[in-house]
Amino acid sequence: MDSLETAFSTDPRAQQVFTTICNALDHLGLNRHTDTNSDGSCTAHAGVISDEFRLRLIFTVRHQIDCITLIVALPFTAPIPRRMWAAAAVCAVNLKLFEGLFEYNMEDGSIFFRMAENYYDAQIGEQQIRAMCYKATHFIDKYGIKLRRFCEGVVTLEEFLEDIKRKG
């Protein structure tokens, strides 16, 4: 029995959800690899190229709380002089999102996109996993380029906020 089978030996529903994630990534033509984490959760990693960025999709099934998370790190960070204001920029973007959110680590300036889906009373299918991938890359393309321009100092916070307000 491999480590993935061991991780889900007490929760066949979690195993089914993880298999669905892996199948969806395979059907999207994405190269993936899987890991078992120390907390008993399992993770599938897949690289993807969006319109603007090279990204790594990280799906994690946390069987302890019946939850799938998708986390995607943006391939840039906010430099130290802009870190406090980058928090305001990320908050402004989050107000525009209807699903998922951007997270920001002020300590190192990293920005992530996160989506979560509970599977306690739900049937998770490949279409739902593909939709999570598409939504994540769409929101990252739409707002990630704006966040990168802000972090690089191309636009001021005021210009960034006006652009977000005007164009969404």
Predicted segments with their positions:
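Short, highly charged C-terminal tails/helix-capping segments
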Residues: 148-168
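Long, contiguous binding/interaction regions
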Residues: 83, 89, 117, 123, ...
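Long, continuous compositionally biased terminal/linker segments
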Residues: 47-83
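Short beta-strand micro-motifs enriched in acidic
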Residues: 35-37, 60-62, 105
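Short, internal acidic amphipathic alpha-helical interface segments
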Residues: 73-110
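Charge-rich, low-complexity N-terminal segments
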Residues: 1-56
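Long, hydrophobic, amphipathic alpha-helical segments used as structural scaffolds
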Residues: 98-101, 143-155
